[in-house]
């Protein structure tokens, strides 16, 4: 008899036909951001690849979505966007991503969308789009305004 516990209870939520859900996160704008937060480790990454585009192309977007949806064997799939700052890709990019999800999803798949953003570029058009498609939006805020503005600054050093 082994001293190792049976791992099957850890994965019992799935079965051979429906394994447990997994979550994939896309960073379509790479490390590009419209802020210059004092504690950010990500901004310096841009300098590591000065000759490479950091924006996801439409061909890459379609391949990513097709592979993401094909690889999920559960009825619920989360399409998650993060950055840098994902809204720098523009609203048209995300509208296209929703179109591509509709094109590639299987009939039984239910899609959930999430986005983590600093919110600087959000406006009424973004709000309408995110609401229409049921996005769960995480908004990055660092506490009270004086604390937030001390750390989350724009490229001119001003609080956001």
What are these regions (language model features)?
Residues 31, 47, 86-87, 120-122:
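A short acidic, glycine/proline-enriched capping/turn motif at secondary-structure boundaries
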Residues 52-56, 86, 156-157:
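Pocket-edge positions in alpha/beta enzyme catalytic cores
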Residues 28, 83-84, 117:
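Short glycine-centered, acidic/aromatic-flanked micro-motifs in structured strand/loop junctions
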Residues 1-26, 44, 72-74:
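N-terminal [4Fe-4S]-dependent radical SAM core
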Residues 19-59:
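Canonical Radical SAM [4Fe-4S] cluster-binding loop centered on the CxxxCxxC motif
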